[in-house]
């Protein structure tokens, strides 16, 4: 079906008007919410109690690394589990690590980009380590045996160059973290798919989870769906003396 230029302009104007009205309504709702929030906000600095039990102790070695525990100490992770989704429920995705398809966007900072499969990780040295997973609050908490690969080996497989300074991980519930590549290359940082010698359960982050044992648990992001590498800018050349 063909339409005239006049009709097209009319449709465009109506569409823009609708979008403007929608935006205005949304902004109006936000303004009401902001006004309500601000009306309850203290007009000066006031004393408030600290969060109960926060932060929980996170034992570390003198060099900042995480203590490694014997496999015999491994066990479950305590509740409550944290998901940022409807009803705090585990989002429905493909949980079988053998079927994982994870977007890896290296943005020109590596030789490889595209979709990560389990067969790619199988080419790397597979390792197991037993670490404490500790939330910033007293729970969730647990000593767990994790099996997977070092993130540094994964980065080398991609051919990541030094000018890639950060990686953003996005989870199935759209929670995300940004972490420096320098931190991710620490030998204790892992991409894991087994928990206590079994596939990671959906509620604990199947099919693939990041483990940073020397940070609180929310940095060990669950159910990775995307990884994007970026940089604030290439490193400066040495300055003249």
Stretch-by-stretch model annotation:
Residues 188-221, 227-230:
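A recognition module on extended beta-rich or small alphabeta surfaces enriched in W/G with H and D/E
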Residues 21-153, 157, 213, 219-241:
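Near-N-terminal "mature-domain entry" segment
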Residues 1-19:
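N-terminal secretory signal peptides and thylakoid transit peptides that target proteins
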Residues 109-111, 174-176, 197-198:
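Detector for glycine-centered tight turns/loop "hinges" at secondary-structure junctions
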Residues 162-170:
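Surface-exposed patches in mature extracellular/periplasmic domains of secreted proteins
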Residues 11, 150-154, 196:
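Short, hydrophobic/aromatic alpha-helical segments in well-folded domains
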Residues 175-185, 189-193:
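A contiguous pocket-lining binding segment that forms or flanks enzyme active sites
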